[in-house]
């Protein structure tokens, strides 16, 4: 039991280092993806090409989230594997899980992770949105106040986009202007995205793995990984766009709820808007896996345990 706990702590340490490193290295793609998703139809791409330093605005929020999420992931997944393991005599809970039980454990762990990172995702979105307000074209696209609230339009006070650059000032501003609700915006879309992520990734990976099972080489592994990432992004990008919009500083003035957000994007901006930022998200997803695995392996060796245990 002591050895199992020791291995778990080492896994958490290696996972945390890998998660923070991966988050930092791929954050420019996250910045560009989120920036594009926040833009209304017809906004020039150049709007989200500011100084290079802006590409890391909001990275601190995601790094804090990555650290906490990793701890939560290992502990939650370990507990779920133990609960779902039918063979109580087996100490290796993970290896004895069947495909469906493994999917259930992964999905539930993903939902718990999503609930944890929602406040940090909101902070990140606020910081990225505020980093773009220096661009004059963006300032012209503030919410329009309507005389009467309808499903198509929301009649409330327009919420100006504030200029915030640091993590703690962002938290303070969000609480003062929008209250505690500012940290849980986009919860519905985030949970649905996580469920879709887990199920689609599991299904797509299995399908591509079987399709290329005749080729037992490194190339087939790379192809399987890229194909899975492409499928994942293509099928979940609309939910990701809605999530970003619902987490924006002026979401409450523009959308009544998640369904209204989806409807207005479709009617006012067109179907293509649901796939905004997909190229940058694909780049991030494609690179993240390799970076995380490599760093995790190296830290595992330094800590003196097998990363495959």
UniProtKB/Swiss-Prot annotation:
Primary location recorded for the protein, binned into one broad class: mitochondrion
Compartment list: Mitochondrion inner membrane
GO biological process: mitochondrial citrate transmembrane transport
Gene3D superfamilies in UniProt: Mitochondrial carrier domain (1.50.40.10)
Membrane association type: Multi-pass membrane protein
Residue spans crossing the bilayer: 12-32, 47-67, 100-120, 184-204, 222-242, 285-305
A GO MF label: citrate secondary active transmembrane transporter activity
Keywords: Membrane, Mitochondrion, Mitochondrion inner membrane, Repeat, Transmembrane, Transmembrane helix, Transport
Superkingdom as given in the UniProt entry: Eukaryota
Positions annotated as Solcar repeat: 6-83, 97-211, 216-302
GO cellular component, one term: mitochondrial inner membrane
Family (UniProt): Belongs to the mitochondrial carrier (TC 2.A.29) family.
Protein name: Uncharacterized mitochondrial carrier SCRG_05595
Taxonomic lineage of the native organism: Eukaryota, Fungi, Dikarya, Ascomycota, Saccharomycotina
């Amino acid at each position: 039991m002591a050895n199992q706990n020791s291995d778990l702590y080492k896994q958490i340490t290696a996972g945390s280092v890998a998660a923070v490193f991966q988050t930092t290295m791929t954050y420019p793609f996250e910045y560009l993806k989120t920036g594009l998703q926040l833009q209304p139809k017809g906004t020039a791409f150049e709007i989200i090409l500011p100084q290079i330093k802006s590409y890391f605005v909001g990275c601190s929020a995601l790094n804090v989230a990555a650290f906490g999420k990793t701890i939560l992931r290992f502990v939650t997944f370990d507990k779920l594997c133990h609960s779902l393991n039918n063979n109580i005599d087996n100490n290796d809970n993970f290896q004895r899980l069947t495909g469906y039980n493994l999917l259930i454990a992964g999905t539930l762990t993903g939902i718990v992770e999503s609930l944890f990172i929602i406040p940090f995702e909101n902070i990140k979105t606020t910081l990225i949105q505020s980093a773009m307000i220096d661009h004059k074209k963006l300032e012209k696209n503030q919410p329009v106040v309507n005389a009467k609230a309808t499903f198509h339009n929301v009649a409330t006070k327009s919420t100006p986009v504030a200029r915030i650059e640091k993590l703690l000032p962002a938290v303070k501003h969000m609480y003062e202007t929008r209250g505690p609700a500012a940290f849980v915006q986009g919860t519905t879309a985030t949970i649905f995205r996580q469920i879709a992520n887990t199920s689609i990734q599991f299904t797509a990976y299995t399908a591509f793995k079987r399709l290329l099972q005749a080729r037992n080489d490194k190339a087939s592994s790379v192809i399987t990984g890229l194909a899975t990432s492409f499928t994942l992004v293509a099928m979940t990008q609309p939910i990701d766009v809605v999530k970003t919009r619902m987490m924006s500083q002026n979401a409450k003035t523009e959308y009544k709820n998640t369904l209204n957000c989806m409807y207005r994007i479709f009617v006012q901006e067109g179907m293509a808007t649901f796939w905004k930022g997909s190229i940058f998200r694909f780049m991030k997803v494609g690179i993240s896996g390799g970076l995380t695995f490599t760093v995790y392996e190296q830290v595992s060796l330094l800590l003196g345990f097998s990363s495959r245990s």
